[in-house]
Amino acid sequence: MTKPIEKNMLRSRAIKLPEVTESMWEQVDEEHRNLVQEFLDAHSFRDKTRKQYYSSLRQFFWWVHTSLNGKKLYKISKRDFIRYQSFLKNRGMSSSGIALKKAGVSSLNNYIENVVAEDDHNYEKFRNFTRGLPAIPKTTTYEKVKVTYDDYKLMMDALKEDENYLGMAWLATAFNVGGRRAELIQLKTEILDYPVPEGQSYVMSHKVFGKGKGEGKPLEYMINTEALEYLRLWHEKRGYDHEYLFTTQYGGEPKQMSESWADYFCSDVLSDILGRRINPHLFKASCITYLLEVKKVKIELISKYVAHHEDVSTTIKHYDLRDFEEEKNQIFV
């Protein structure tokens, strides 16, 4: 009998909003549809951001069509948008999901306020109605349970037994380097030729692009010798050369790995090994927490060189999963 996976859920996941089909979209006010297309065409968004904005704007304007009787965008008020946020919240959407939907509308509004308003008298007095609203109450669907070093070794041992060299390379890099899934797949094979400087236990990667406007924020990651060891093993075993380290074969042709591979690998392989829910986003926090908790590295250094944050408070708020058990045990001694 298969061992059940511990989900670590704090609340039920929201049911996805129904897709806004093409026939539904055709019913939306033509001006709104044109504004969405103009906005997307005017910006050099990353593919992922573009898809998110396109989806969220279709959802918003379908709601405007059905719930606000197709009210023109320039007539929509802050109160109307609060109603939209309530609509999303009442369907169980998490605070991060609502924030993502809000971001798409806010970005469109900024474009209209700064560009469209100059040429369209209807928008002369238009203001971004998503600004200055009450903060969205934070909700958490899954408890973040850190991947410990023991968890990491257990997974690596299981992958070694399976001769899953790609999995070992990805896991060793994710746990030791702390990059996001979209950043890891940008690592190039040339890294394996970089010499490790004397007195160091890492090499600096070439530039990869992280989250941010346009192509994204340029980042360089510290690739330690343990990650390099398993990257070399994978390179040796895969049997072909390629510009990128993380590759998979599609129709017999090797191609750069997609972001979704990490989702599958974590949910269908690593989760079964540990018996609890594992997702790619855990590894950045787990890497940072391991360096803080076990290696005792100063958080200022980790924040700057591993997390790539300008403010240490961002690292503490989102990625420090320490439980401080040793300190707590001193309280009632």
UniProtKB/Swiss-Prot annotation:
Catalytic residue positions: R180, K211, H281, H308, Y319 (o-(3'-phospho-dna)-tyrosine intermediate)
UniProt xrefs under PROSITE patterns: CB, TYR_RECOMBINASE
Keywords from the UniProt entry: DNA recombination, DNA-binding
GO molecular function: DNA binding; site-specific recombinase activity
Domain Core-binding (CB): 30-113
Residue ranges of domain Tyr recombinase in the record: 142-332
InterPro entries named among the record's database cross-references: CB (IPR044068), DNA_brk_join_enz (IPR011010), Integrase-like_cat_sf (IPR013762), Integrase_catalytic (IPR002104), Integrase_recombinase_N (IPR010998), Tyrosine_recombinase_XerCD (IPR050090)
Domain of life: Bacteria
Similarity comment text for this entry: Belongs to the 'phage' integrase family.
Name of the featured protein: SPbeta prophage-derived recombinase-like protein YomM
Species of provenance: Bacillus subtilis (strain 168)
UniProt gene name: yomM
